[in-house]
UniProtKB/Swiss-Prot annotation:
Active site, per annotation: 115 (n6-amp-lysine intermediate)
Role noted for this protein: DNA ligase that catalyzes the formation of phosphodiester linkages between 5'-phosphoryl and 3'-hydroxyl groups in double-stranded DNA using NAD as a coenzyme and as the energy source for the reaction. It is essential for DNA replication and repair of damaged DNA.
Keywords associated with the record: DNA damage, DNA repair, DNA replication, Ligase, Magnesium, Manganese, Metal-binding, NAD, Zinc
Enzyme's top EC category: ligase
Name assigned to this protein: DNA ligase
Species the sequence originates in: Oceanobacillus iheyensis (strain DSM 14371 / CIP 107618 / JCM 11309 / KCTC 3954 / HTE831)
EC number assigned by the record: 6.5.1.2
Gene Ontology terms for molecular function: DNA binding; DNA ligase (NAD+) activity; metal ion binding
Gene name tied to this protein: ligA
Amino acid sequence: MNKEQVSKKIESLIELLNQYGYEYYVLDNPTVPDAEYDQKLRELQQLEQDFPDLVMENSPTQRVGGAPLASFQKVTHNVPMLSLGNAFNEQDLRDFARRASNGTDQPISFVCELKIDGLAISLTYENGKFVRGATRGDGTIGEDITSNLKTIRSIPLSIKEQGTLEVRGEAYMPHKSFLALNELREKNEEEPFANPRNAAAGSLRQLDPKIAAKRNLDIFLYGVGEWENSDLTSHSEHLTRLKELGFKTNKEWKKCNTIDEVIEYVNYWTEHRNDLSYEIDGIVIKVDSLDQQEELGFTAKSPRWAIAYKFPAEEAMTTLRDIELSIGRTGVVTPTAILDPVRVAGTTVQRASLHNEDLIREQDIRIGDKVVIKKAGDIIPKVVRSVVEQRNGDEQEFHMPDECPACGNELVRLEEEVALRCINPNCPAQLMEGLIHFVSRNAMNIDGLGEKVIIQLFQENLVQTMADLYRLDKEELLQLERMGEKSVTNLLEAIEKSKENSLERLLFGLGIRFIGSKAAKTLAMEFETMENLQKATYEDVLAIDEIGDKMADSIVQYFAEEKVTELLSNLRELGVQMEYKGPRKSEQATDSVLSGKTVVLTGKMEKFSRKEAKEIIESLGGTVTGSVSKKTDIVIAGEDAGSKLDKAEKLGIDVWSEQQLEDVVGK
């Protein structure tokens, strides 16, 4: 064969093998024996070996390969991967349905799906090619695990879809694979994984993709982050179209027209969850209409149009051996139960929450008691009650100390608070917890500065304040345990990079009481610089939407403290930037025809890419959304605009051509 013939042969083998793989891994309905598949694969491998320049990206041979990575790169999700609010009973579900119905004028239907117990991931395709796979991370920033995801054979390396498509799903380990993996680990005298979720997450975070390839992972796709060329109008249409494109979706989803149908679905799977070949930990319920999803919108943490029903928590009994106290960054003293190890909901539990002194006293929980442990939402273990009838008289009552176990200062109970608190600003436990918070992902996001490293730096007296982090030098760090040349270099680079963070990250990292990440962003947008915020009065802060009196009081008191002024001065001198880097109110166009308008883009654009058009509209003060609703002001229609244009015309929404957008830009 000449090279052109070889190229055609390779193309036909890839097409055939990918079809066989789709039938086997996605449809679970193979049409050829394994031996025939293997023979065709060997033929392809030989041709690719003889003609390496003809190897194609969507070849099944490209699923595993390449050297192990040094580390995972960070990935920013264009559309955040938010977590869902939780429902634990029928009333929670009915309340969710009522809130959703109150938020829209039209009748609501729901889609119910099994909540797969695995690792949330994102897959991005550009013009049909799989270009990136990432973990959810904190919802805004994840890790690039493309090489590992390529080893999952139910993930297509190419699809027939132009433009950008980002799909979301759950990578998981089937029961059969989990049992086989743990058998192998025990045979090799390795620690077995506690549950399939941990096994799946651990496999996908291996730097060597060949390890992930051996773990027999699978995936279900359940949603869309971005879809450049879609005119679909419902979540159920998304699921159907994803399946048509070759993605593996879970067949057990159901469209429900009433909340009673939803509850019936939930009850069925609560009873039958153990019949499945994979783990589920609940049911996800979503409003089906994309327009209604748009209307309902989001809170800071989750969409208002979806909720996760969590199965009833599992319980187990064990012995409470001791009660330890920990001090948080705000000085709150939290008791934790130390337990004899016990298996609950697939994991081994040795510590559990006791919340506060009042709970211990009210429930008469004693050291030495037999106690019932429950995993709330199958995640956080907590002590539910003591088994009083099993007491033998040796149990000891627990009393909270009068002094802080970390610094010896008197513990106090502030007005209207249940918890005891240490109010010593120099308490070492609070300082250390504050540093751990400062470097965390939602705050300054300093890679390589995990809890263990912070504790080590604190105990070695190298870091006592946030400013000290920016004074660390290479020689000091090299003296620490497990800190080699490369890890020290990477750490110092990460610390240096964090100096360029936008103001909201620094504000959140400072740990001001009552100020979460959303409030920090609101303050940063409003005041734009740390200096402006430091000068702000109580009235200035309270005047901002979403900032209440407790927050305003906390902010003003915080910046009035001398040690805070000194800390911020030190951070400035060390090069930490203190300005908001997002779109500023003072820079937003207010005289533009698009200012304050909600805009939808549809159809194919000739002069602008979707991304360029979106950036232009936002720079002129507009907001771009994905679907047409009564809240839409303008629809900009390119060629083949489809159903979004039809809906805009029915609703009487202003429709622009691409030329009209260009004319506005020209002005």
